[in-house]
């Protein structure tokens, strides 16, 4: 992603309860792990995040707020997953999603991911937030 992409992403605002995913305006750590997703006209529609740890690939993503809730998530998720697999060749793909985000969890389950655990992370702005760990079942 370019500096302009990160600046645009920082302006994205999600409706409740998804405002948890709004940018905190802090510089992104490890920007080289982020990839821009664009439509046919070149407009930024989302981002992909990958972190490889040995043969396990952590996958994260975000879809532009005005595109959420329109049944685009599964195709977007699968396209990003294929991109990550082609780039990193992992033996396992895993992700972490806020437990309240049932909409995303359903998408990930439809894509073949299953819950493998839960953990709590503490945020200055949000306090304690439960996350679901999910692994791809192949």
What is each residue range found by the language model?
Residues 3-68, 77, 83, 87, ...:
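Acetyl-CoA-dependent GNAT
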Residues 59, 73, 84-86, 125, ...:
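Alpha-helix termini
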Residues 61-78, 99-106, 110:
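Conserved glycine-rich acetyl-CoA-binding loop
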Residues 90-94, 98-105, 110, 114, ...:
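C-terminal "cap" of GNAT-fold acetyltransferases
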């Amino acid at each position: 992603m370019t500096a302009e992409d990160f600046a645009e992403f920082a302006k994205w605002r999600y409706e409740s309860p998804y405002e948890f995913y709004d940018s905190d305006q802090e510089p992104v750590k490890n920007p080289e792990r982020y990839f821009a997703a664009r439509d046919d006209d070149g407009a930024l529609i989302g981002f992909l995040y990958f972190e490889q740890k040995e043969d396990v690939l952590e996958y994260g993503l975000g879809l532009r707020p005005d595109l959420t809730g329109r049944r685009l998530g599964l195709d977007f998720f699968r396209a990003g997953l294929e991109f990550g697999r082609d780039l990193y060749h992992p033996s396992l793909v895993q992700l972490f999603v806020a437990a309240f985000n049932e909409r995303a969890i359903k998408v990930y389950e439809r894509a073949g991911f299953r819950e493998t655990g839960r953990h709590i992370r503490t945020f200055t702005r949000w306090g304690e937030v439960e996350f679901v760990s999910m692994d791809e079942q192949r």
